[in-house]
A protein has these predicted regions:
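Long, low-complexity C-terminal extensions of enzymes
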Residues: 362-511
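N-terminal Rossmann-like FAD-binding beta1-loop-alpha1 element of flavoenzymes
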Residues: 6-35
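Predominantly flavin-linked oxidoreductase catalytic cores and closely associated redox partners
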Residues: 149-299, 357
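Dinucleotide-binding Rossmann-like beta1-alpha1 core, especially the glycine-rich loop
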Residues: 47-138
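Glycine-rich FAD pyrophosphate-binding loop
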Residues: 25-51
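Short FAD-binding loop at a beta-strand-to-alpha-helix junction that anchors the flavin cofactor
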Residues: 327-345
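Low-complexity, highly charged intrinsically disordered N-terminal segments
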Residues: 96-170, 174-178, 218, 230-233, ...
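Conserved FAD/dinucleotide-binding core of flavoprotein oxidoreductases
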Residues: 268-319, 340-351, 363, 371
Length: 511
C-alpha cells in the first residue's frame, strides 16, 4: 500500500490525453531513469471530438512549462490570439445588443466600487469599455502585443484560438520526442482488476497487458475506465443547462489576408447560441442548441443563415450535459470529456484539463495509501469547480431579457436555477461580487468575471447608502487611466492578422 506511484498509464489521446501527458511528464522527468514512466495508449481508429478551439490565458504558462516554443505552437496548430469573449444578442436580442468579457480584470478592481460609479460617470459606454482596454482592442482587430515582443509576453492578457486536431498532434510529437512519453497505438480490449479492486492492467490487442499504478481516463464520451469499468454514476445538469446538441462547420475566409478576430463571438439564437472563432486560415463555427426547443433541420437552417448560406457540410455532436459523481475512483482519474462535458460557452473544457492534470502533477509521487487522501481532495475540489461552472454559464441565461422563444423563458424559471446562484444574485442586488463569495484560491471564474457578465447584461442593483469604497473621484481616475492606456495601445499595436503573419514568417523572439 505504501509503494510509490511510478507508472502512469493514460488511455486516450486528443487534447485531453496529450495535454495531461505533457503536464505530468515535464514535471516528473518521464524520459529519465529516476522519473515517472508515462505511457499513453490510444486507438488508431478513434478520432478525438476536436471542438475545443478556445483556451484561457493559463495555456501560455502551461505550454511554456512544458518547454514548447510559442512560435512552433502558433505555426503548427493554426493558432491565433484571443483576448476576450463577446456576447451578441444575449440581453434583448437586438442587433446592437453586445457586451465583452475580457481577460484583464477591471482597472482599479478591488480598490474602488467601479460598478456603483460607472453609470453616473460614463452613461454612454458599456461597463467593460470603461474599465478595460481589451474591448477596444478587440473592436479594432488588434493583437495583444507588439511584433517585437518576446514569446509569451504581452501588453494585454491573451489566450488562443487553435485547431484542436492539430493541437493534439503537436502535443503528441512534443511529448514523445522531448518529454519521454511512451506512445502505444492499440485497441484496449479489457481491464484486469487487482485483488483490492484497483485496475492492475489494460488488455490490448497487440501489446499484451499494460500495467500501471495510476490510470488516467481520457477516452471522451465513452469514459472507458471511470464510467464503463467502475460504473461511477453520471450527474446530468440538463435541467439547468438545456443545450444538448451542436452543429459544427469550418468556414474558409474570403481572402487570405482577411482580418482574424481576437475575440470569441457568441451570438444568441432562439434555441441556443452560435460560436464563431477566428483562426489564421479559417473560422470555426457552430450552433449549440436545445433539442427540446428546436429541430436539427431548423438548427442547421439557422446556422447557414448566420453563415450566409455557406454550402459546406455540418458535423453533428450530441452532448449529455453533466459530469461524473466523482472524478477519481480507486487508482483511476478521469480527465476531459470522460469526466464531464457541457456547452462550451466560456471555453472551460481545455482549462479544466489543465487544472486536472496540474493537481495530479502536484501530488506525485504519492503512495497508494496517500492516494486515498489525494482522491478525496481532488473530488471535493472538482465537484466544487463543476458546480461553479454550471452557475456561471447559467448566469448568462438568467440575466437575459429575451422573451422571443420558450428557450429563453424556460431558462429563467426559478426551478432551473441552482440555489447557490439564486442566493448570490440576491446578495449582489446590494453589493458587487467579491472574492469573499468564493472559496478557492484558483477560482475557475473569479469575481471580476461575474462583474463583466452582470453589468454587461444590465443587472440592476438596489439603491443602497453610499460607502467610502464608492469614491467617485477615485473611480473617475481609474476610468481616465483606462482611457489613456486604450489610446496608447490602439496607436502602438499591430492587427491580429499582422502579428500572426509576421510570427509565421519570422518567428517570435525567445526570452
Amino acid at each position: 500500500m505504501n509503494k510509490l506511484i511510478r507508472r502512469i498509464v493514460i488511455v486516450g489521446g486528443g487534447s485531453a490525453g496529450w495535454l495531461t501527458a505533457g503536464i505530468l511528464a515535464a514535471e516528473h522527468t518521464a524520459g529519465s531513469a529516476p522519473g515517472v514512466k508515462i505511457t499513453l495508449v490510444e486507438s488508431p481508429d478513434v478520432n478525438p471530438i476536436g471542438v475545443g478551439e478556445g483556451t484561457w490565458p493559463s495555456m501560455r504558462h502551461t505550454l511554456q512549462k512544458m518547454g514548447v516554443s510559442e512560435t512552433d505552437f502558433v505555426r503548427e496548430c493554426d493558432a491565433a490570439f484571443k483576448q476576450a469573449s463577446r456576447f451578441d444578442r444575449w440581453v434583448t436580442g437586438t442587433k446592437d445588443d453586445s457586451y465583452y468579457h475580457p481577460f484583464t480584470p477591471p482597472h482599479g478592481f478591488g480598490e474602488v466600487n467601479l460598478a456603483s460609479q460607472w453609470r453616473a460617470l460614463a452613461p454612454d459606454q458599456s461597463f467593460a469599455e470603461v474599465v478595460s482596454h481589451q474591448p477596444h482592442l478587440c473592436a479594432n482587430g488588434l493583437a495583444p502585443k507588439q511584433i517585437t515582443a518576446p514569446e509569451w509576453a504581452a501588453v494585454a492578457n491573451y489566450a488562443y484560438h487553435l485547431d484542436a486536431g492539430k493541437f493534439g498532434l503537436f502535443l503528441q510529437k512534443h511529448c514523445v520526442e522531448k518529454l519521454g512519453v511512451v506512445h502505444i497505438l492499440d485497441h484496449v480490449k479489457g481491464v484486469k482488476s487487482a485483488d483490492n479492486g484497483d485496475i492492475e492492467s489494460l488488455r490490448t490487442e497487440a501489446h499484451g497487458d499494460i500495467e500501471g499504478d495510476l490510470f488516467i481516463d481520457c477516452t471522451g464520451f465513452s469514459s472507458l475506465l471511470l464510467g464503463q469499468h467502475f460504473g461511477v454514476p453520471f450527474i446530468s445538469v440538463k435541467d439547468t443547462l438545456f443545450c444538448d446538441t451542436a452543429l459544427a462547420m469550418q468556414v474558409p475566409y474570403p481572402q487570405p489576408d482577411s482580418p482574424v478576430a481576437s475575440v470569441t463571438i457568441s451570438t444568441a439564437q432562439e434555441a441556443g447560441w452560435i460560436w464563431d472563432i477566428g483562426l489564421p486560415t479559417r473560422r470555426g463555427t457552430g450552433y449549440v442548441y436545445s433539442s427540446s426547443h428546436t429541430s436539427d433541420d431548423e438548427a442547421e437552417r439557422v446556422l447557414r443563415d448566420y453563415l450566409q448560406d455557406f454550402d459546406g457540410s455540418a458535423r453533428k455532436i450530441s452532448i449529455n450535459p453533466g459530469h461524473r459523481e466523482s472524478f477519481w475512483y480507486r487508482n483511476c482519474v478521469a480527465v476531459g470529456i470522460s469526466a464531464g462535458f457541457i456547452e462550451p460557452l466560456e471555453a472551460s473544457a481545455l482549462a479544466l484539463i489543465e487544472l486536472s492534470a496540474a493537481m495530479i502533477r502536484d501530488e506525485l509521487p504519492m503512495s497508494r495509501q496517500a492516494m486515498e487522501i489525494v482522491s478525496e481532495r481532488y473530488n471535493e475540489r472538482f465537484r466544487y469547480r463543476w458546480d461553479r461552472i454550471v452557475d456561471f454559464l447559467k448566469l448568462h441565461y438568467v440575466l437575459s431579457q429575451r422573451t422571443d422563444s420558450a428557450f429563453w423563458l424556460d431558462n429563467r424559471k426559478p426551478e432551473t436555477i441552482p440555489g447557490h446562484l439564486q442566493r448570490l444574485l440576491e446578495l449582489w442586488r446590494y453589493r458587487p461580487p467579491s472574492h469573499r463569495d468564493f472559496h478557492e484560491l484558483e477560482e475557475i471564474f473569479p469575481a471580476s468575471s461575474y462583474w463583466y457578465v452582470l453589468y454587461g447584461m444590465g443587472f440592476e442593483q438596489a439603491g443602497v447608502d453610499p460607502k467610502r469604497s464608492d469614491d467617485p473621484g477615485l473611480a473617475r481616475q481609474y476610468f481616465e487611466e483606462n482611457a489613456g492606456m486604450t489610446e496608447k495601445f490602439i496607436r502602438g499595436l499591430p492587427s491580429n492578422r499582422q502579428l500572426i503573419d509576421h510570427l509565421v514568417k519570422h518567428g517570435i523572439y525567445k526570452i
